[in-house]
Amino acid sequence: NGSGKSSILVKSTLETWRDVIVAIDIKGELSRHYQWLLQNRLVQRPYIVFNPSNVGSHYDVYALLKKGGPNFVQYVREIACAIIPKPSDVREPYWIDMARDLLSGAIVYYYELGLDFIGTILMVQDTPIAELCKEIVQEGSDLARMFVSEIAGLKQQQQSAIGTEVKRHTMVFATDPDIQSALSFNKSDEDGFGAFSWEGIVSDADAPNVFLCISQDRLEQWGGVLRLMITQLIRQLERRPEKYSPQGRDMKPFLLLLDEFPLLGKMDVIQNAMTTLRSKN
């Protein structure tokens, strides 16, 4: 909560915790303190700072899609649902559900064409919804068509309402150059440098710590980015085996630090995870 006591507690945790940490670091204090600890050899684990204002590490939104396999649709839906949230008090969830379906279909379609996440979002922003649906129905895979087939048959006014919902939530990814750079797949990533995904962070006992640094004055603007990343992290943690199962018995503990948590606003995925993740270590 930003008080002196909480700051001391969090910093002392950074000094003593020996397993992987992911920290939301609004003010940048935690990453600076950890850098000092590392320089003074008080800790040994390397670390990553994800900061769209000063891009050093890139985040790969599509890391799990590249695995393919039976969970491909689940991974697509996690991205779409994180970008387009559905408030618990929404009166007409139909339009949000359709917007999620449209974005899911577009993700599948453009991913299969070889576009990365930002490339997909740019195409969604630039293409009229009726034209996008028609293109996916005519040229997309069976999976992509399944997501948009109902939308393609709606009246133009209804399609426009769905498209407005999609474009409103994806606008920041298409217009903010810092976000585009932070979430784009670039040449350095091809060699395995500069890009990270939660799968490696969660599953590898030797993974680096990660500090998500988004300055307080950009929280409202970049809230969708943080929600996407945190949702993908929580879902990856939920896939860890139960800590008392044979597979989870040797699983190292994982620490998620939510510094300045109230500043993030309401994030249902975090609140729901408070109970589900206790058994995941």
What do the PLM-derived regions correspond to, one by one?
Residues 1-280:
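P-loop NTPase motor domains
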